[in-house]
Design a protein with these regions (language model features):
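Conserved catalytic cores of phosphodiester-cleaving nucleases, focusing on short active-site segments
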Residues: 79, 112-128, 140-141
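Mixed-charge intrinsically disordered linker/loop segments at interdomain junctions
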Residues: 2-10, 168-202
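Active-site metal-binding core of divalent-cation-utilizing nuclease and nuclease-like domains
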Residues: 93-116
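Short amphipathic alpha-helical segments and their helix-coil junctions
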Residues: 53-66, 117-126, 200-204
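Buried hydrophobic packing segments
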Residues: 80-84, 138-145
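Charged, often low-complexity linker/regulatory segments
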Residues: 1-78
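Nucleic-acid nuclease catalytic cores
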Residues: 128-135, 143-180
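An alpha-helical interface "stripe"
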Residues: 69-101
Length: 205
């Protein structure tokens, strides 16, 4: 019988999941979910403002030589937030920053960015490094949102983990309680149009 990951009587926050060295499938299994990695076909918007994308890219290239982005806060401020601000300007959705959720002793804390539209939600976690361990934290946050949302709509929760230079997406299929990690990653700023298209596609679907 595998050793339990969670200790009795201890309260876990989302950031604790980043410190866990267990594989994602073992962590989510203890929370009652299954896990899969595969090629995800994510919604994409074709209605992309090319000028907006170019402005974001130009601003990044102009400012990045002048600042240090070796902290989580700096990556959020200069590499992630500008993309999200661009998305929110073009759609009908609400963006919460450092959104507090408390479900139970295992699932509580702050979600970096929480997008909510009429149809879909996106949980976005920003880390300064280590995409894999960051994904464990994202998984916990997506499961927390699933449990926190009282109704069954939307039937899918989207998530993204970003270390600034790299993004990876995931979905949580609520009905069958399965978390799916996309096998692909997207680079910033090289794949900025793809990242923007996916975020907008999810929220406007």
């Amino acid at each position: 019988m595998p050793k339990k990951i969670f200790k009795e009587g201890k309260k876990y926050t989302f950031s604790d999941y980043f410190e866990m060295k267990n594989p994602t499938d073992e962590i989510v299994a203890e929370l009652g979910y299954s896990f899969l990695t595969k090629n995800l076909v994510l919604p994409r918007s074709e209605d992309i403002d090319e000028a907006l994308i170019e402005n974001l890219r130009t601003a990044y290239y102009a400012i990045i030589p002048k600042i240090s982005v070796n902290s989580e806060a700096s990556k959020r401020e200069f590499m992630i937030a500008p993309i999200l601000q661009g998305v929110i300007r073009t759609i009908e959705a609400k963006l919460n920053i450092e959104y507090a959720i408390e479900v139970d002793e295992r699932l509580s804390g702050l979600i970096d960015y929480f997008f909510h539209s009429k149809q879909d939600v996106i949980v976005i976690e920003a880390k300064k490094g280590d995409l894999e361990r960051g994904f464990n934290q994202l998984a916990a946050e997506m499961i927390a949102v699933d449990k926190y949302e009282e109704n069954d709509s939307p039937n899918m929760i989207y998530g993204a983990i970003s270390i600034g230079e790299v993004w990876r997406f995931a979905i949580l299929e609520r009905e069958i309680k399965r978390l799916v990690k996309d096998i692909h990653t997207f680079r910033f700023p090289e794949d900025l149009q793809d990242i923007f298209s996916i975020l907008k596609g999810i929220l406007s679907s």
